[in-house]
From Swiss-Prot:
This is Small nuclear ribonucleoprotein F. InterPro entries: Lsm6/sSmF, LSM_dom_sf, Sm, Sm_dom_euk/arc, Sm_F. It holds the Pfam family LSM. The keyword Glycosyltransferase does not apply. Residues 8-81 form the Sm domain. It is found in: Cytoplasm, Cytosol; Nucleus. SMART domains: Sm.
Length: 91
């Protein structure tokens, strides 16, 4: 079983800039996956090359997306292998 390590949110987000991330929203089973382009002091997020996922199903590309901080449930980094395996499970 893996151990979960607590991290400070701002340094965690700043370290993810330029990397692929997944952002789960508080409602609707919505998740956005894309490259974290920027984050501000309020932790609002700007994603590039974004895809919308609802209830685990890819709904297609959206391009550039801005997500207001109070809508975010969690943010996680994703790697290429993890994303490819999830897409293969979809097919």
């Amino acid at each position: 079983m893996s151990k979960i390590e607590a991290l400070a949110p701002k340094p965690f987000l700043y370290d993810l800039k330029g990397k692929k991330i997944a952002v789960r929203l508080k409602w609707g089973g919505m998740e956005y996956r894309g490259i974290l382009a920027s984050v501000d002091s309020y932790m609002n997020l700007q994603l590039a090359a974004t895809e919308e996922w609802i209830d685990g199903a890819n709904k297609g590309p959206l391009g550039e997306v801005l997500i207001r901080c109070n809508n975010v449930l969690f943010v996680r980094g994703i790697d290429d292998e993890q994303q490819q395996s999830q897409q293969q499970q979809q097919e």
